[in-house]
Regions:
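Nonpolar helix-loop interface/hinge motif
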Residues: 1-50, 88-91, 153-230, 236, ...
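Membrane-interface segments at transmembrane-helix boundaries
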Residues: 1-22, 67-143, 160-194, 249-277
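Membrane-anchoring/interfacial helices and their immediately flanking loops
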Residues: 40-60, 136-147
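Membrane-embedded or membrane-proximal helical elements that form or frame transporter/channel pores
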Residues: 52-71, 238-239
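Hydrophobic core of alpha-helical transmembrane segments in multi-pass integral membrane proteins
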Residues: 123-125, 148-153, 216
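Membrane-interfacial helix-loop-helix connectors in multipass membrane proteins
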Residues: 129-148, 218-235
Length: 277
């Protein structure tokens, strides 16, 4: 059981890596169960011409991987949460919970995507209309537009950080409805959105750099070294099995850190332990 206490950003990342290493075998088995089919199809796509040659299949497997990723994320959150609270979780428990949370997580993800997508569209329209208008207004006009545009980007990041732990809320808390996770996540992140942003950026780098580098090398070597390119394409297709649980580890610890800071969750757990003993 990890010590229940408020954590700094480095402690959350280090704790996430520690839990990931501790349960690596269980998380990988869950990852294989969740992603073996989309990973296999992705490998086939990569070695037979890629998305341009199989556009319809590419879209289908992308959707399949998304839903399987929801299953994997929910199951991994269960494993990490139980470990953090000093409990043991069997693979069957993680699989059962993961399967039961696919639809709620899809609904929440769709709602979040629509909201953030709408903000992106508004920012794009602002840029498309504002640049021509302000270009004739001199330096003052351009500076004003720059301030407004930066403010819009800040708003997008602020909203995204406010809803950063909706997934953990859906998986770990009893809710009347999945969309209650939006208000709950916003409440937990109140006052800590900069910290959430920093952790999300670092976690995103940890996840995306290996995938991006391996995928880029595979594409770059497609002509000069097809054999090595095929091997790298296989590795790129398998990386989500390894890396998706790592993201779940980091964000789950961040969720508990927010609960400890906002709700004294550590004292709640301690009182329950004292009562049970």
């Amino acid at each position: 059981m990890v010590e229940l206490k408020p954590m700094e950003m480095g402690e959350i990342l280090d704790g996430g890596l520690t839990l990931y290493r501790r349960h690596f075998g269980l998380l990988i088995r869950l990852g294989v169960i969740a992603l073996w089919l989309p990973a296999s199809i992705n490998i086939y796509l990569q070695v037979t011409g890629g998305a341009l040659q199989h556009s319809v299949l590419y879209v289908i497997v992308a959707l399949l991987q998304y839903f399987c990723g929801l299953f994997l994320t929910a199951g991994a959150i269960r494993i990490i949460s139980d470990s953090y609270l000093g409990k043991e979780t069997a693979l069957a428990d993680a699989v059962g919970l993961g399967a039961s949370k696919i639809i709620p997580l899809f609904g929440v993800g769709l709602g979040k995507g629509l909201l953030l997508g709408l903000l992106v569209v508004v920012i794009g329209m602002l840029a498309g209309v504002g640049v021509p208008l302000m270009s004739g207004s001199g330096v003052a006009g351009l500076l004003f537009f720059a301030v407004v545009f930066i403010g819009a980007i800040w708003l997008l990041a602020f909203v995204a950080c406010g809803y950063a732990v909706t997934t953990q809320v859906v998986v770990l808390e009893p809710l009347d409805g999945a969309f209650d996770s939006f208000g709950r996540s916003w409440e937990l992140t109140k006052g800590f959105k900069r910290k959430v942003a920093n952790i999300a950026i670092l976690a995103g780098i940890i996840f995306n750099i290996p995938v991006g580098v391996v995928s880029g090398l595979a594409q770059g070597l497609a002509v000069s070294n097809p054999g090595l390119s095929a091997v790298l394409a296989v590795v790129a297709a398998l990386l989500p099995i390894v890396l998706t649980p790592l993201l779940a580890c980091v964000f789950t610890l961040m969720y508990y850190d927010l609960r400890i800071r906002r709700e004294a969750f550590d004292l709640q757990v301690l009182s329950q332990q004292l009562v049970s003993s």
